[in-house]
Amino acid sequence: MQPKNTTHKHQRSLANYCRTGEYTPIPGVKEKNVGRYRQLIFNNVKGSLESAYPLTHNVLAQEEWEELTQEFFSSHKCQSPMVWQMPKELYEYVLETNYKLADKYPFLIDLLLFEWKEVEVYMMEDIEPYPFTEKRINDAGLVLNPEIQVLSLEYPVHLKNAKDITKKDKGHYFVSLHRESETGRILFTNMHYPHVQVIEKLAQEPVNFEELLKIFLQYAPEQEAREALQQFINASLNSKLLLGQAIINSSSIN
């Protein structure tokens, strides 16, 4: 039996070879055989990333995607033992290394973030919402779906085909991603800043229509503000971004 420290040394050598392709002889291991093992592991990594980033995989040229995933696999030491979190580390790798493709594809960071957040929201633990009813209750606060994230983006990766996005599209964009509890589907909602303010307020506690209206009145006359807020609420109830109205006590739904 080999000493424990020797075994660990060989394990590190094997792990380093799997990442970099630089082979250090390991007793009892043939390089041609371990090469197949490395390819198998890399294919699993690449497959996981392609599954998480279908839009990014589609917009990059095949050789660009191969080079990106190979460089990530070779030079980045993943911190999480959970495979589903690996795509987050690819996003962070591109962000932190100022990866060269970001010059050719200025929207790349936003696209990676958008696709990763879809995975993250899908995989997040269940969050118990504030007690609510779908019945209409006068003056009751609206209840936000707690399984949500709101992103601030520079490019409209949620609105346009990535291949059609140019530097002229750069601006300020907001999008929310939420999970529908019945189906587990991830739905996204394009937003403007007043919508984001509404979501931020509802994230703290249920708030009624008249209180939320104060936000919209900062941007539009009263009639226009009322109509815009009501339209947003109706659409959000339909998509389950909003779940209903808060139940304060049992008499609220009688």
Task: Kindly give the residue locations of the regions a language model identified.
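Generic preference for hydrophobic/aromatic residues in regular secondary structure cores
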Residues: 14, 141-144, 150, 176, ...
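Low-complexity, glycine/alanine/valine/leucine- and proline-rich hydrophobic stretches
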Residues: 148-204
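A glycine-rich beta-turn/hairpin centered on an aromatic-Pro dipeptide
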Residues: 118-165
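Short connector loops at helix/strand junctions that flank enzyme active sites
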Residues: 85, 143-145, 171
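Long, charge-rich, low-complexity alpha-helical segments
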Residues: 1-133, 189-254
